[in-house]
């Protein structure tokens, strides 16, 4: 429970400090391999999207591999790390930045992006719903 605050931003009514996904500038994603026309398989990343804890850290399996004495387990850790690295490389090449604690979370144009990229300002603020309900 103590780790939850590291991964989910609480609701914040301050338009100057919106949670990243509410700006439309953040995306959670993984990689898949195409097996056949219309058939895909998710690549193993070592944890599910939204996992809480050390498993979610982008370089977690690199560190685990470095400390692992079992060659087979080490290869598994390196495979997970390689998949995470491939995702990061593709997204960074497209101008996104990665959340420091989540292998799956990338941003472009929000406050996280401005902080990690050194941009002076974010491009996007909070998007408020305009959908009316009865």
Place the predicted regions along the sequence by residue.
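Cell-envelope/glycan interface and biosynthesis
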Residues: 1-129
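Terminus-proximal functional modules
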Residues: 131-133
């Amino acid at each position: 429970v103590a780790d939850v605050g590291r991964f989910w931003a609480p609701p914040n009514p301050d338009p100057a400090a919106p949670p990243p996904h509410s700006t439309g500038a953040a995306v959670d994603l993984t990689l898949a391999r195409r097996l056949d026309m219309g058939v895909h398989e998710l690549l193993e990343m070592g944890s599910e999207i939204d996992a809480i804890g050390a498993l979610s850290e982008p370089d977690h399996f690199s560190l685990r591999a470095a400390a692992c004495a079992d060659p087979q387990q080490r290869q598994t850790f390196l495979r997970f790390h390689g998949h995470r690295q491939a995702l990061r490389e593709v997204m960074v090449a497209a101008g996104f930045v990665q959340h420091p604690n989540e292998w799956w979370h990338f941003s472009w144009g929000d406050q996280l992006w401005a902080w990690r990229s050194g941009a002076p300002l974010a491009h996007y603020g909070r998007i408020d719903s305009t959908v009316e309900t009865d």
